[in-house]
Amino acid sequence: MPNILPIEKQATAVLMLCEGNSIRSVERMTGIHRDTIMRLGIRVGNACADFMDSRLRELNCRRIEVDELWGFIAKKQAQCLPEDYATGLGDVYTFVALDADTKLVPSFLAGRRDEVTTNLFLDDLQGRLSNRIQLSSDGWRSYANAVHAAFGSEVDYGQIVKVYASPDKTEERKYSPPRITKIERSPIVGEPDHISTSYVEKQNHTVRMHCRRLSRLTNAFSKKLDNFKSAVALHFAYYNFVRFHKTIRCTPAMAASVESSPLEVADLIEMAR
């Protein structure tokens, strides 16, 4: 007979991954072998990606904020060899769109921080919406062209750029960001009346706290890009459909009228069967 892990233990392992634990720490706490946990996370993560792709459609969002957060695969970009680029090693950015009202993440994409990935991300976002939106982003140079290509003139889009002070050479900041001296808001398309990325920047913090592969100074980073994408998909499925948000007092999927009740971790596992 095949040695199949009971659904309760699978749910425990997946929940631990979704709450910021590394694979090896889950192994120590549950006694499940790390290779089994890895395969489970990939399988459930891929199923979650397919589920969200089909479920998050015709969304009635009003204010969307987009941003990208940095991570890396196997090694940081400065350590990469020319041949590493084709295999997906080095820096990876996760582009995230957040509905400022419901806190739903309707679209996300992991890849290089370049024009191609930005275009794919905005195209995907546009295809999930049913109405005109207010869209805000930072000043990343590829956003303006990507928004124009995806939305045309059917969007109210603005950029917010934060200007930072030059750090004093004697200042011991360690990992703290430099001081913000000015914030510039610029309308790009249409008539955006509220340009802000505050909520999506807070969402970046949530991702780093709940997805161990993206934690600051982590030693639990991904070794393969495909595994990283599966972990990110698992996180956002848990965030959108399972975890209660304290501000809105329900899951983001419920707030956006995508679901009428929260899902359980066991439901995510069932999708992968």
Regions found by a protein language model. Give the residues of each.
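Residue-level recognition of single "structural anchor" positions
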Residues: 1-273
